[in-house]
Structure formats: C-alpha cells, structure tokens
Amino acid sequence: MGRKKIQITRIMDERNRQVTFTKRKFGLMKKAYELSVLCDCEIALIIFNSSNKLFQYASTDMDKVLLKYTEYNEPHESRTNSDIVETLRKKGLNGCESPDADDYFEHSPLSEDRFSKLNEDSDFIFKRGPPGLPPQNFSMSVTVPVTSPNALSYTNPGSSLVSPSLAASSTLADSSMLSPPPATLHRNVSPGAPQRPPSTGSASGMLSTTDLTVPNGAGNSPVGNGFVNSRASPNLIGNTGANSLGKVMPTKSPPPPGGGSLGMNSRKPDLRVVIPPSSKGMMPPLSEEEELELNAQRISSSQATQPLATPVVSVTTPSLPPQGLVYSAMPTAYNTDYSLTSADLSALQGFTSPGMLSLGQASAWQQHHLGQAALSSLVAGGQLSQGSNLSINTNQNINIKSEPISPPRDRMTPSGFQQQQQQPQQQPPPQPPQPQPRQEMGRSPVDSLSSSSSSYDGSDREDPRGDFHSPIVLGRPPNTEDRESPSVKRMRMDTWVT
C-alpha cells in the first residue's frame, strides 16, 4: 500500500528516531547515487547525527568534491530547511514529506473509493455462494404434467395428430410421471403398438398406427376393458386412426365415408379447456375395423350431472358441430335424455368412446374401434356417477345394451378434444336415427369440451325421457361375449375436489 505519510517533526522516541535515521540516510544516499548516474554529476554528502557522528557519501571522491567546493566562488543555489519548508508550503504539502514515489504512497479519496468498491464486489461474490443448479425438467412431447403416481405415456409414432389445446411439450418435474408404475395393468392393444393402453379385439387397427399419447397420469385401471382412465390427465391427445390425416370433420357433416378414426381433438380449436390435474377417465378410441353400424342417432342430450366448479367452455349449444362429440362405446342404460350444460361440461371425464358421432340429418354415431369397450378406470375408480349395467363386448364386434332400470354411467371425454379424421375407410352407412341417451358426464372435474349430448339441432336437449329405452347393438358377430361391468354408485362431486 505504500509508505505512510508522517508529519515532519522531531521524533520523540529515541529508538524510532534511530531506525528512521538509518532508513532515510540510506534512502538519501540512494537518491544521490541515482542522481549522479542519471544526470552525470558529482555529489558529496556530509551527515552528522545527533551524537555528532559523521556519515558521508561522495559519488567519486569526497576530497575532490570538497576541493571544488572550497574553490568555487561564483554565485550558486543554496537552500536551507526554511527554504525547503517554504517551497513545500507553496506546493501545498504543508511541510509534510516530499511526494516522491519512493518515499510515500498516498491514499487519495479516489483510490479509497476504488478499493472499497472492489472489496464490496468481492464480498458480494463470495457471500453469494455458488449458483444454484437449475431444476431438472424432463420434457416429454405432448404430455401433460400430472401429479398421479400412475403416470403412463402411450406414444405411437404412426401419426402426429395432437389435440390443438395440448401443450406440445410439458415439462414433468415429477419423476413419478416419467415411467409407468409396474403394478398398472397394461395390455397391448395391437401387436404393432406395444405402448398402447389395454384393449383387445380389433383396436389394433387404429392404435397401432396412431400417435396416441395419453397424457401422463393415465393409469390403466385393472378392469382392463380397453379404456384408459387418465387419472389426473388434464388433456387427452386425440387418437388418429390408421392412415388418418388428422382432419377435423366440418360441422354437422355426415359420417366420414372412410370412417376416419375418431380423434379427440377439439371441434373448435378456439375453445380452451381449463382442466385441473385431478383424475380423469380416458378411453382411447379403438380400432377402425369396428366402424359401428349404429343408427344415425340424434343425441338429444346427455346426462346432466351436477355442475362442478371447474371452469369449462360451454360447448352444448344446439348449433355445436356434432362431429366433435366423443361418445362412450357403451350406451347409457338410463332411459332419459339429459341436457348437457356448460357447468356439466366441467364434470365430463374424458370417457371417450372409441367411436365418434357425426351428426348429419340424424347424428350418425360412428363408434370406431369399440372392440375394446373397457370401462377400466371408470368402473374401478368409481367414476361412473350413475352406475348402469353396460353390456360391452371386448371382441371385435360389440353388442351394447342399455338397461332402463339402472341409471346411466358417467362417462367423460378426457379433455373433450375430438378430432375426427376423414380417411377413406369402410364404414357402414348410418342406420335410421334412433334417439339414444348418451351419458358423457364424468364426475371428475375435467373440463370436457366434447358435449356428448349436444344434438344435431339442439332440440330435446332439456327434456329427459324416463320411459325411453334404446338398446344399442354394435355391429358384431352374435357369438361375441359381452363384458358386464358392475354398476358403480355415482360419487359426490366433493370427492373430486383436489
């Protein structure tokens, strides 16, 4: 830091005075040496200390220098202490030590500020500690972050149809969502698609070639009817049928000639569903081979379940395009038609039917791939609000009968996003329309955009008909076995509060 400036006064301490004399005497001689060499001059120093001890320095020979001094008679510069003090005072040094670099190093206010700032910066850097590691986010394409430990992600690179409202890549910070639990039931739907949700029958046609990405958290229910209960999956990625181009069927268009595999993409991409991460049943559409020859049914309404607090976009207006409706493969045993209100939509629990309804003059309910009609999660999870005996066939042909006695089950579209694929596939023409009450209302607080109950013209939406019983026979061989699922008591909506 340099030498400290001292007041040029007599040092009272004897010891300090001796030390200072020794140091400065040598410094003076050093300066004389430098001056003699640099400027080619002769210098002689004669010093007597307080004890009258002589110390002398001469650049060459003291006698020669002294001889010149005695013989020199011309005017010359001669200074004393008073002269030096006066000169220093004029320079503003106030009699302090000479500002030679070797003699002192001054701490100017500017230097003090610099040093203090450097110290503060260094202290801040050291005290701040090492930067925290960034959180590890696992990016999974077209999956929705969920909190359910049963996180299964089904992906098939066959096609790239994705529901427009689904996040393309949602980061899953929870490691439990990255791998499916070993205990979950996972039956391969198609030989070519090992990552399919459990289903049997002819579901292989659609699932094997579709890009079915079930949102994480879609844990397979042990029921294993071919449907996946997407527990806490906010969104459902639309399943595209084999060779489907992911085309959304226009509003109120007749069933696609090819019976394109039904997707669950939203009919109206502008509709945004806010889905809380609570358990939501999901049923991936089954194979296209089972283009169900259901009658062109005018789905007047769907079961009106208790409105949930979940925010939902009302898609139940009579003019809504029926094509976006995803219907459960199982007809409701309930005999009455129910109106689906926007509040009810929040309760829809993504129980997407493998088939979709394209309502033309009478909404033709194409239930593609119902071969795997499995209420896996809904029955096991008790998510069916009004348990009804559903006669579902897991074989390629399904004979679904609705029993008037038992109330309809709550079926919900996982996210209500239905994208109907218009692919030229063999589909039986819609039979004469039969009014069939379809229950798509799920108890989970899912915001299902697919208003399964919205009729083609919106008529008869609000009039439940208790005396109506419409058994729906899906085109299947008569020898197909029906899977009878136990009716489940409808759960109260307070149980869905997360």
Swiss-Prot record:
GO terms for biological process: apoptotic process; cardiac conduction; cellular response to calcium ion; DNA-templated transcription; ERK5 cascade; MAPK cascade; mitochondrial genome maintenance; mitochondrion distribution. Residues 444-457 have a biased composition (Low complexity). Constitutive phosphorylation on Ser-406 promotes Lys-401 sumoylation thus preventing acetylation at this site. Phosphorylated on these sites by MAPK14/p38alpha and MAPK11/p38beta, but not by MAPK13/p38delta nor by MAPK12/p38gamma. Sumoylation on Lys-401 is enhanced by PIAS1 and represses transcriptional activity. Phosphorylation on Ser-406 is required for sumoylation. Has no effect on nuclear location nor on DNA binding. Sumoylated with SUMO1 and, to a lesser extent with SUMO2 and SUMO3. PIASx facilitates sumoylation in postsynaptic dendrites in the cerebellar cortex and promotes their morphogenesis. Residues 458-468, 479-498 have a biased composition (Basic and acidic residues). Residues 198-220, 388-400 have a biased composition (Polar residues). Residues 172-220, 240-268, 388-498 are annotated as: Disordered. The keyword Ubl conjugation applies. The modification Phosphothreonine is found at T310, T317, T413. Residues 3-57 form the MADS-box domain. The modification N6-acetyllysine is found at K247, K401. GO terms for cellular component: chromatin; cytosol; nucleoplasm; nucleus; transcription regulator complex. Disulfide bonds: none annotated. Residues 426-436 have a biased composition (Pro residues). It comes from the Eukaryota. The record marks D174, S175, D211, L212, D457, G458 as: Cleavage. There is a cross-link at K401 (Glycyl lysine isopeptide (Lys-Gly) (interchain with G-Cter in SUMO)). Pfam families: HJURP_C (PF12347), SRF-TF (PF00319). Belongs to the MEF2 family. Binds DNA as a homo- or heterodimer. Dimerizes with MEF2D. Interacts with HDAC7. Interacts with PIAS1; the interaction enhances sumoylation. Interacts with HDAC4, HDAC9 and SLC2A4RG. Interacts (via the N-terminal) with MAPK7; the interaction results in the phosphorylation and transcriptional activity of MEF2A. This is Myocyte-specific enhancer factor 2A. It comes from Mus musculus (Mouse). The gene is Mef2a.
